[in-house]
Amino acid sequence: MDSLKNHLLIAMPSLDGSFFERTVIYVCEHDEKGAMGIVINRPIGLSVEALLIQMDLDAEANLSDDAQVLIGGPVLPDRGFVLHSPEKVWTNSEAVSDYCTLTTSRDILNAIGSADAPSQFKVALGYSGWSKDQLEQELADNTWLTIKASSELVFDVDYEQLWTLATKELGFDIWQLSSQTGHC
């Protein structure tokens, strides 16, 4: 299977009632060892500004109330992950695409609270991870649909609308799909 890095995983309706119900996950890494991604449409009810204040970091910049901390996934829920535009690289940054970098070091949080903030960012606690061949099996089991990610879908779409808009990118009504089709 080709790498799904820089793709979105869209939860199938069959995941309703689970942790991943109507989630959209931005895949940051995918290779023969497994995969890692960040849920980009599940706010936890805490603004980024409030998080910075809790961490005793300056919040000089006027952060939008729309800048919410996300549940990135069930793995390491106390660890922060920041998806951001690549204007600058911080201590622990890795490019995911030409429009998105993943940073896990605290220095980016200092920048987010200042005039040095990246133009686009999402802050998440935790990540979603898959061991070797686990994601491939979940795809074969019709747990996820995939589309190529875009800057607009990753950064610009409202959290509540992202799952619906991402499913529309597929070109069909996701509610008409059966989880039992496509495999012999």
From Swiss-Prot:
It holds the Pfam family DUF179. One of its GO terms (cellular component) is cytosol. SUPFAM superfamilies: VC0467-like. It comes from the Bacteria. InterPro entries: AlgH-like. Belongs to the UPF0301 (AlgH) family. This is UPF0301 protein Sden_2674. It comes from Shewanella denitrificans (strain OS217 / ATCC BAA-1090 / DSM 15013).
